Amino acid sequence: VRSRGLGDVYKRQIGGNTCNGVTSADSASTLHAWEALVELTGVNGKRYLPIKDFYIKAGTVDINVAEGEIQTAILIPKASWENTKGFYIKYGMRNAMEIATTGCSVNVRLSADKKTFDRVRIAYGVAGPVPMRAPSAEAVVNGQPVTMENIEAFSRAVLEDINPRDSWRASKAFRSHIAVESAKRCLIESVKLAGGVL
């Protein structure tokens, strides 16, 4: 995996970004939006966890170190990515080597005529103690026409699901504002990538 505009120009593997369990990891929200599976391998073989179950609490993931488990793969099911386009926005104080103040990932599958939201998924980093989806926002647009009015309603609905914190990086109110704005921008860009017209 190589970042472009998200951080530094170093090449890296994705496991370190997930195994540390922090909600601010750049890959965390995107892997949640794509409904990824985590493959864990240990002395007793392999097991697979949905990414939403992998993150237990802030800074803690479900790896059994006593059994020598390590993360060996991230899998994204074909049904999650087929005919689907997505976009990620990271908000931080700097352009490089920065921990996200908020990270938002949206992906969309449009109807064949590109006029209806067939499926929309949105996930956040730094909107709660673990990366999280915003199912209320998803429900607002799934099955609905691709319109700016629906995109605006989608972006406002994220506030029903997220619970950002106050910190020295940003206040809860500011993080909430960024979450709404990034939801809107991510969905607009995802629609464009999927061939939709606004």
Predicted regions and their residues:
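C-terminal structural segment of proteins
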Residues: R4-L198
